[in-house]
């Protein structure tokens, strides 16, 4: 399939899922497997702001972070053959959700609260998972908090065109599964040329 005919809608891939679901690990591997570019939105936001996300939250608040996130997302408008790793809460910000829905294909990396807690219990760089005054949660407390946040986010996560369960699965297997499904999705999609029009049938 020529690059000039690949549909933009289906070859701009947004990876969503809770922190710890594997987006930042799977994303570059998936992009490499597909021959696509890769962008980690959280890393791009930090570069744009000149400081880590924890400081953005602490000094400017979540609303300022979400707006920075949206502006970063808009830089990929019109791109194709790119995998974009989203922050876990990006879909909860309505303007970002609307942009993503119209710009590309959403893929949900799904994992259980128990497995997410196991992966995140020793992480200190997730602002929404901290206790009061930055106190570290016990694993049980963390799992319960993740469960509550997942319940809030799940309706939008479930809008994804593709969902892949990452629990009890090797990273390589997940990448292979996603590669097959995305390539199938791109093949089935209407072909769009550089002028944005579908080519005429012979």
Curated annotation (Swiss-Prot):
PROSITE patterns: SHIKIMATE_KINASE (PS01128)
UniProt GO cellular component terms: cytosol
GO terms of biological process kind: amino acid biosynthetic process; aromatic amino acid family biosynthetic process; chorismate biosynthetic process
Subcellular location, principal: cytoplasm
Catalytic activity: shikimate + ATP = 3-phosphoshikimate + ADP + H(+)
Family statement: Belongs to the shikimate kinase family.
Protein name: Shikimate kinase
Organism expressing this protein natively: Chlorobium luteolum (strain DSM 273 / BCRC 81028 / 2530) (Pelodictyon luteolum)
């Amino acid at each position: 399939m020529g690059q000039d005919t690949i549909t933009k809608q289906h070859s701009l891939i947004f990876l969503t899922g809770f922190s710890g679901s594997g987006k930042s690990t799977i994303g570059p591997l998936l992009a490499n497997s597909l021959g696509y570019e890769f962008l980690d939105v959280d890393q791009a936001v930090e570069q744009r702001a000149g400081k880590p996300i924890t400081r953005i939250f602490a000094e400017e608040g979540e609303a300022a972070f979400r707006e920075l996130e949206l502006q970063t997302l808009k830089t990929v408008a019109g791109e194709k053959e790119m995998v974009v790793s989203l922050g876990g809460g990006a879909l909860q910000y309505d303007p970002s959700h609307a942009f993503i829905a119209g710009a590309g294909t959403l893929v949900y990396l799904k994992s259980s609260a128990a497995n997410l807690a196991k992966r995140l219990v020793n992480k200190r760089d997730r602002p929404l998972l901290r206790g009061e005054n930055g106190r570290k949660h016990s694993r049980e407390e963390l799992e319960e908090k993740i469960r509550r946040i997942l319940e809030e986010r799940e309706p939008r996560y479930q809008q994804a065109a593709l969902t892949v369960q990452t629990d009890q699965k090797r990273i390589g297997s997940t990448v292979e599964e996603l590669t097959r499904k995305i390539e199938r999705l791109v093949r089935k999609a209407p072909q769009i040329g550089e002028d944005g029009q579908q080519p005429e049938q012979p």
